[in-house]
Each structure stands twice: as structure tokens, then as C-alpha cells.
């Protein structure tokens, strides 16, 4: 943290444009990249091979221009002159990521000094935990939904150019372009027959995550400009990601914008019932208006990707549905808005009336097939959604195996406790319980019935099932007691941290959807 502050102070006081270039050759930059105290991003694939001595030798060779060019030209070879260049390339890429993060941290710092702090404008930026209450409170009043799959750039150069306007150091920018140009010829970065989307799904290098997030933020900043129909962005945090003076030139392919009279040109965007949610490479646009407006937004997104980012995105990238007729997948849930018809008797003087009221409520159901596949991937159930004994957990201690199944069951309960229909929810918990019993019985080399008699099954029941689960097993489904419990919907604040297989759920469902 102190190192970051020191570099920020150095950049703030410096008047040279090429201050980022010498930072790239400092060993302490790579110490920040591979240290565990970075507050920018979680360190990925860290191991003890990245020592300061290796980085120092690498930076010494990089000072020599001939060796650096040879290193780039021979990036497809495992070794050259006794050095592992693929390994060195990974080190250099992490260094690029830290230097670029320092650059944008400096711009955020300068913006805060000028009174452009973005704390007040965070009222429209909410965490993932507020999405589920949003569905219950506001989604029922909207009628159209658009599923958007954010396309990947076809070439890494598009991502690099996104940082060109913000990078003041021309030498550093050309160095990044030079390195990517030669490094892309190697087999270790871009597979010849695979696209950049496959590359991003398998690689989590710091610099590529930053460039991709920069691309998404710039695309969303243009979307927010169109949404807010204003000549000045309301979310000041986006101002650091592109130059304002080039904005109207970039946007001219989408709509005709007049800088003097912008409100009349973008008057048709005025709609208070529009909401945008982005998660895991996809986004949802929901609004309450005619189908014409949401179809306009569909083609605005397509033209934006084609004209601004040179990304071909066909109409099949965006799906438009009515919320009252279709359900959609979101973070492992099936969400729908059914309309319930209720009859209210009203009496005025001697006359009585029957009034029919349509009540729309958000119904969130657990995806049983995807949840069973996620439990099978975690070796907690069989592929046919049946209880199975985990061979890996059988070799561990009995307390460790029980804790593992309890943790999975608890995470599953916390994540799906807000669902309206909990039949699938109870089925998965039933599978997890008996998978744990089978695993422990296999460890003790006995049958399930013998193991239950020996260990007392009531204790396992208390561990695996809450009071609500026990009522669902004891009372009939039509019981008033069960219906009283089933109406209770609780959203936990730590759902994304407690659920270990939410990413697998979304990948499984998303692969079928798009």
C-alpha cells in the first residue's frame, strides 16, 4: 500500500510524459504484482517461482534492446539461450498490469482533488446483493426485458487502444503494443484456432482483466450518456476512461447529437422506468414502455459495438422478451412474473361490487438440473442427481467430510432460501444429506443402515435440516403450517461469498441460453 502511494506521489509531481516507461523496469513493480497485499485485484496463480532475483535478471536483460527483441521474436519457443521466455512473458504482463493500474489510480486521485469525487454519484451503482430486492420491488412494474451478451473484441489491439486516450506516456503505450504484437505470435498467448473469448475464459492475467474491464466501462459510459441525455455524465467515475473532447466524434455513428440543444435530440430517451444490470459477461436491460423503444435500444447496442469498437454483433446477440410471458435465468435462478387474479368484494351503500385485481409478483425458483450438475461437479452427488459416496472425502477424517458436506449444504441453503418454490431446494438438500451418509459409511466400511444406527441419525438431521425443512418432511404439502413457512423468503447478504458453485450454475445455464 505504501509503495502504491509512493508511485502515485511520484507521478503527481512529475511533469514528464514518459514517466511510466522507467517504472516498467523497476523490480519493486513486480513485487507489487506478485505480492499478497494488492488492493486492486486478487492475485491469481501465485507460486514461489516468482522471486526477486529472477525479476532482477529479467529487467537487466530488458535494458539491452537486442535481447528484448530476440525475446519477443522467439516467444513461441520454450527456451532461448538458457532462459524460459514464456515464463518471462508472464512476469512482464503482470508488470504491465500494475503500471496501468497506477496510472488510473493517479487519475482518480487527481479527480478527487479537483472536486470531482464520485462518492455522491454512487447512488445508481449498487452491489449484487441489492439485485434480488430490486426484483421483488420494481421488476413487477416493468414489462419488457432484453438479454444482452456482451461480445468480446476480435483482436487484442482494440482493448489496447481503449487505454490510448488515457495513457499520457506515449513510450509506454507503444511498448505495450510492441509486446502484444510479438507475443501474440507465440502459442502460449493466443491459440491459432480459438477466439479471444476462449482466451479470456481460461486466462486471468492482471493486464487482460484490466483491459477487458476498461472496454466494458467505456461501452457502458456511452450507454449511460444516452440514458441520461445530458452533455455531462452524471457518474463522474466514468470520466477517467475516455477523453471528453473525442466523445461526439465517436458517437456520431449512433445518433445525431447537437452539443447546443442535446435535450431535444435525445428527448425520446426520457424514461424513468429503465434499469440496467451487468453480471459475468452478460447484462439485462428491463424497462416499461412500448416494444418500439426496446427494439431501438437493441440496435443502438449493435451499432455501438460495430462502429465504436469494430465488433460484429448480430441481432441474435440480444434477445427481447415480455416479462409476463417468459421466465429468464439470472445467477442460478429462474425468474418470472406471474399474474395472480384476486377478487375483492366492495360495497357502497346498498350496492355491492366484485372487483378483479391483477397482482404481479416476482417468482424465483431454483434450477434443479443446474444445481444437481453443480453438486455433481463438486463430487457431492452422482451425475443422475442421486446420492453418491465421494471417494476423495472418504480418505479424509470423518469430521472433515462432515464439515465439507455441511458447508456445501449451508451455502446452498443461504443462496436459495429466497426462492418462492422450494421443492427443488429440498430435493438437493436431501441428496446432499444422503451423499454425506454414504461417504461416511464407506469410510467406516459398513452399510448405510448400520452406520445410521451407530452414529444416531437424529444428529445428522439436526445438522442438515432447519425447522422449515423438518416441517416439509413431517406435514403434508397442503398443510397450513408448511404454507406459512414456504411464504417466508429470506435473502442473505453474503450469498455470493457463501455459494461456492454459483459460477458453475451460471455457466451451465448461460451455455444453454446463448
Swiss-Prot record:
Keywords: Chloroplast, mRNA processing, Plastid, RNA-binding, tRNA processing. One of its GO terms (biological process) is tRNA processing. One of its GO terms (molecular function) is RNA binding. It is found in: Plastid, Chloroplast. One of its GO terms (cellular component) is chloroplast. It comes from the Eukaryota. PANTHER family: MATURASE K. Belongs to the intron maturase 2 family. MatK subfamily. Usually encoded in the trnK tRNA gene intron. Probably assists in splicing its own and other chloroplast group II introns. This is Maturase K. It comes from Phaseolus coccineus (Scarlet runner bean).
Amino acid at each position: 500500500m505504501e509503495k502504491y502511494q509512493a508511485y502515485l506521489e511520484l507521478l503527481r509531481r512529475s511533469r514528464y510524459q514518459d514517466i511510466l516507461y522507467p517504472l516498467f523496469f523497476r523490480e519493486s513493480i513486480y513485487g507489487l504484482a506478485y505480492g499478497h497485499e494488492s488492493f486492486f485485484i486478487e492475485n491469481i496463480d501465485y507460486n514461489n517461482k516468482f522471486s526477486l532475483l529472477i525479476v532482477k535478471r529479467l529487467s537487466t536483460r530488458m535494458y539491452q534492446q537486442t535481447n528484448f527483441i530476440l525475446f519477443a521474436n522467439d516467444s513461441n519457443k520454450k527456451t532461448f539461450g538458457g532462459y524460459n521466455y514464456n515464463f518471462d512473458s508472464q512476469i512482464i504482463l503482470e508488470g504491465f498490469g500494475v503500471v496501468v493500474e497506477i496510472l488510473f489510480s493517479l487519475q482518480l486521485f487527481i479527480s478527487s482533488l479537483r472536486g470531482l469525487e464520485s462518492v455522491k454519484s454512487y447512488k445508481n451503482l449498487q452491489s449484487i446483493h441489492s439485485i434480488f430486492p430490486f426484483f421483488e420491488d420494481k421488476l413487477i412494474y416493468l414489462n419488457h426485458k432484453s438479454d444482452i451478451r456482451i461480445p468480446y473484441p476480435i483482436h487484442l489491439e482494440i482493448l489496447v487502444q481503449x487505454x490510448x486516450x488515457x495513457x499520457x506516456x506515449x513510450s509506454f503505450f507503444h511498448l505495450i503494443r510492441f509486446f502484444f504484437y510479438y507475443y501474440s505470435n507465440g502459442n502460449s498467448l493466443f491459440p491459432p484456432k480459438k477466439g479471444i473469448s476462449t482466451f479470456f475464459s481460461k486466462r486471468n492475467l492482471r493486464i487482460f482483466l484490466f483491459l477487458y474491464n476498461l472496454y466494458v466501462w467505456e461501452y457502458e459510459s456511452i450507454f449511460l450518456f444516452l440514458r441520461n441525455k445530458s452533455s455531462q455524465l452524471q457518474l463522474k467515475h466514468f470520466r477517467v476512461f475516455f477523453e471528453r473532447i473525442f466523445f461526439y466524434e465517436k458517437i456520431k455513428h449512433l445518433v445525431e447529437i447537437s452539443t447546443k440543444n442535446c435535450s431535444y435530440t435525445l428527448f425520446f430517451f426520457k424514461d424513468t422506468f429503465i434499469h440496467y444490470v451487468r453480471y459475468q459477461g452478460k447484462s439485462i436491460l428491463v424497462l416499461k414502455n412500448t416494444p418500439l423503444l426496446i427494439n431501438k435500444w437493441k440496435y443502438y447496442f449493435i451499432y455501438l459495438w460495430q462502429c465504436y469498437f469494430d465488433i460484429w454483433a448480430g441481432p441474435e446477440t440480444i434477445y427481447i422478451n415480455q416479462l409476463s410471458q417468459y421466465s429468464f435465468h439470472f445467477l442460478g435462478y429462474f425468474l418470472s412474473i406471474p399474474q395472480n387474479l384476486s377478487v375483492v368484494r366492495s360495497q357502497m351503500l346498498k350496492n355491492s361490487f366484485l372487483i378483479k385485481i391483477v397482482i404481479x409478483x416476482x417468482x424465483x425458483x431454483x434450477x434443479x438440473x443446474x444445481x444437481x450438475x453443480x453438486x455433481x461437479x463438486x463430487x457431492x452427488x452422482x451425475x443422475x442427481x442421486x446420492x453418491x459416496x465421494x471417494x476423495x472425502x472418504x480418505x479424509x477424517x470423518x469430521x472433515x467430510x462432515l464439515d465439507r458436506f455441511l458447508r456445501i449444504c449451508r451455502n446452498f441453503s443461504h443462496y436459495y432460501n429466497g426462492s418462492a418454490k422450494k421443492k427443488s431446494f429440498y430435493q438437493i438438500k436431501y441428496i446432499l444429506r444422503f451423499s454425506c451418509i454414504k461417504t461416511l459409511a464407506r469410510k467406516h466400511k459398513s452399510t448405510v443402515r448400520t452406520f445410521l444406527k451407530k452414529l444416531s441419525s437424529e444428529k445428522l438431521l439436526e445438522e442438515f435440516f432447519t425447522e422449515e425443512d423438518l416441517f416439509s418432511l413431517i406435514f403434508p404439502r397442503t398443510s397450513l403450517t408448511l404454507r406459512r413457512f414456504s411464504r417466508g423468503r429470506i435473502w442473505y447478504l453474503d450469498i455470493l461469498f457463501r455459494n461456492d458453485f454459483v459460477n458453475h450454475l451460471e455457466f451451465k445455464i448461460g451455455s444453454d441460453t446463448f
